[in-house]
Amino acid sequence: MAEANLDPVFQIQRVYLKDVSLEQPNSPEILLNQEQPGVDIQLGVDAKPVADGMFEVTVTATVHTKIADKTVFLVEAKQAGIFEIRNMQTDQLGAILGIACPQIVYPYLRSNVADVIQRGGFPPVHMAEINFQAMYEQQQAEAATPQIIV
């Protein structure tokens, strides 16, 4: 009788660009403006099971640049990965999905966002490195804080 293999498994199955959009609602007029635009970057991480032992982890970025109240450009991108994760304890699984997987996916997202912005005729926006462990720990702390409803 063969014994079941209970060794932990963590494998990248695929990394892919799930969605990307670039909007320039005020072009070409805004392109003539010489002011330095403000840049707002928002990030998000989502993880969900897609099959037995298979998970999709998606890192989302929204890059919004404005001059005064007018949008120069808006980029929304979702980079995802499919990971095989088996034989992990529940607390380990959360950390892998919230830290390790986003760290693998994020460099692809950074590159794709910079490329889309540059192809749109703008200097690339270089997104900073992200400490996904700190981000995950902050989310866990916020989730553990009791909500007071008045």
From Swiss-Prot:
Pfam families: SecB. One of its GO terms (biological process) is protein tetramerization. Keywords: Chaperone, Cytoplasm, Protein transport, Translocation, Transport. InterPro entries: SecB (IPR003708), SecB-like_sf (IPR035958). It is found in: Cytoplasm. Homotetramer, a dimer of dimers. One homotetramer interacts with 1 SecA dimer. One of the proteins required for the normal export of preproteins out of the cell cytoplasm. It is a molecular chaperone that binds to a subset of precursor proteins, maintaining them in a translocation-competent state. It also specifically binds to its receptor SecA. This is Protein-export protein SecB. GO terms for cellular component: cytoplasm. Belongs to the SecB family. It comes from Polaromonas sp. (strain JS666 / ATCC BAA-500). One of its GO terms (molecular function) is unfolded protein binding.
